[in-house]
UniProtKB/Swiss-Prot annotation:
Residues with the O-AMP-tyrosine modification: 402
Organism: Haemophilus influenzae (strain ATCC 51907 / DSM 11121 / KW20 / Rd)
Protein's recorded name: Glutamine synthetase
Family: Belongs to the glutamine synthetase family.
Assembly and oligomerization: Oligomer of 12 subunits arranged in the form of two hexameric ring.
Reported function: Catalyzes the ATP-dependent biosynthesis of glutamine from glutamate and ammonia.
Cell compartments where the protein resides: Cytoplasm
GO molecular function, one term: glutamine synthetase activity
UniProt GO BP: glutamine biosynthetic process; nitrogen utilization
Length: 472
């Protein structure tokens, strides 16, 4: 049933902010946001019970044209004033429902996230799953690309880019920029985006997110990170969509363009989205214990589930062909499926904490192109499978995995090396996702089909590097 207090708050926000339109936002399979704007005169309490009809056949991977009608079901508790709309607009996040049954749609990512949380509670293992993602992004000055029968090119430029040390600017080249792999926690004047990130943080706070820190990241050409406080799974996925919305729009206001691709530039670090996770029951962190690095047995089993299902998980946590250009040795990307305390070369890390109650597990392979609803839900389901089936991850690996000799490396499993491998793995290893009806098999098949088209398109396209290697 709709939350009466939350609905009352919607009308309070409308009155206090002179709102003219209500924007109903929803997320598709690929993680892209869509929206339908409603004049405020048509917004009433019934809307939160009856929903708003829309054409599901126009969203890739959803309905066919002969069965197109679907419902946007507004979640009143997510209502927030959009700070970027010139006409006062209230945004409300929606789940997607079937109008014939008034049940959540099995291909709606937000509904999948909710079902994952409900399934977790039904197992009795935990009543809350906390997620703290760390999406990194680039801020570029200029991005161009061209794909046609006889051309394939892209061009990126930014005032901070290391390749601009010899560029002539009308106002002169001040030479303050991070060189390759030289940007981590840089300060002004090398960090040119400090005030832009600060503005992003202030707006994110206005929209309900809790900011923990922001800083320049490792790569040249304007790589950044804003750290926000954890939240429960679905709410944190909502917040991740808000995060991207704010980053992109503030960047635009400053003449920049924000890029969440994992590997937009060659030869420097890519952008990840490390995911911190913990489970709570009756208000207690059940990952806290007396095993390795202060973990509980439950936490170790959770890690075991993620490692076991990692290649299938990659389809959701690293859902682009570009993702696997980041997941290569040499750029601080976690390729090997091992766990360790504070060891950033492992794909599963147990961060150091000053308070044992804050103990958590960090999956380091996800990237910011992941649909947060699907990625978080899939990670939770893999972890729960580990707990239910007592999948122990084996011994921790505390050594630098990047420096291991070949004879040791061969015994350590790795993440998928391509989107195609990840999809093949998901095709074979999916039953952990369908427990409790969280991910429908029909949805998994649709997701694989959509992503295979992306793989096929890239496989069929000649690449400029091929001309460099093979033309003459």
């Amino acid at each position: 049933m709709p939350n009466a207090n939350a609905i009352a708050n919607v009308f309070k926000l409308i009155e206090e902010n002179n709102v003219k339109f209500v924007l109903l936002r929803f997320t598709d399979i690929k993680g892209k946001e869509h929206g339908v704007s409603i004049p405020v005169s048509l917004v009433d309490e019934d809307m939160f019970e009856d929903g708003k009809m829309f054409d599901g056949s126009s969203v890739e991977g959803w309905k066919t044209i002969n069965k197109a009608d679907m419902l946007l079901m507004p979640m009143a508790e997510t209502a927030i004033v959009d700070p970027f709309a010139q006409i006062p607009t209230l945004s409300i996040r929606c789940s997607v429902y079937e109008p014939t049954t008034m049940q959540s749609y099995d291909r709606d990512p937000r509904s999948i996230a909710i079902r994952a949380e409900n399934y977790m509670r039904s197992t009795g293992i935990a009543d809350q799953a906390f997620f703290g993602p760390e999406p990194e992004f680039f801020l570029f000055d200029d991005v161009r690309f061209n794909v046609s029968m006889n051309k394939a090119s892209f061009s990126i430029d930014d005032i901070e880019a290391a390749w601009n040390t010899n560029k002539k600017y009308e106002e002169g080249n001040n030479a303050y920029r991070p060189l390759k792999k030289g940007g981590y926690c840089a300060v002004a004047p090398i960090d040119s985006a400090h005030d832009i990130r600060s503005e992003m943080c202030l707006i994110l706070e206005e929209m309900g997110l809790v900011i923990e820190a922001h800083h320049h990241e490792v790569a040249t050409a304007g790589q950044n990170e804003i750290a926000t406080k954890f939240n429960t799974l679905t709410l944190k996925a909502d917040e991740t969509q808000i995060y991207k919305h704010v980053v992109q729009n503030v960047a635009l206001e400053h003449g920049k363009t924000a890029c969440f691709m994992p590997k937009p530039i060659t030869g420097d670090n890519g952008s990840g989205m490390h995911c911190n996770m913990s489970l709570s029951k009756d208000g207690k962190n059940i990952f806290q214990g007396d095993k390795y690095a202060g973990l509980s047995e439950t936490a170790l089993y959770y890690i075991g589930g993620i490692i076991k299902h990692a290649k299938a998980l990659n389809a959701f946590t690293n859902p682009s062909t570009n993702s696997y250009k980041r997941l290569v040795p040499g750029y601080e990307a976690p390729v090997l499926l091992a766990y360790s305390a504070s060891n950033r070369s492992a794909s599963i890390r147990i961060p150091a904490v000053t308070n044992p109650k804050a103990i958590r597990v960090e999956a380091r392979f996800p990237d910011p192109l992941a649909n947060p609803y699907l990625a978080f839900a899939a990670l939770l389901m893999a972890g729960l499978d580990g707990v239910v089936n007592k999948i122990h991850p084996g011994d921790a690996m505390d050594k630098n995995l990047y420096d291991l000799p070949p004879e040791e490396l061969k015994d350590i499993p790795a993440v998928a090396s391509s989107l195609e491998e990840a999809l093949n793995s998901l095709e074979k290893d999916y039953e952990f996702l369908t427990q409790g009806g969280v991910f429908a098999k029909d949805f998994i098949d649709a997701f694989i089909s959509i992503k295979r088209k992306e793989v096929e398109r890239l496989n069929m396209a000649p690449h400029p590097v091929e001309f460099e290697m093979y033309y003459a």
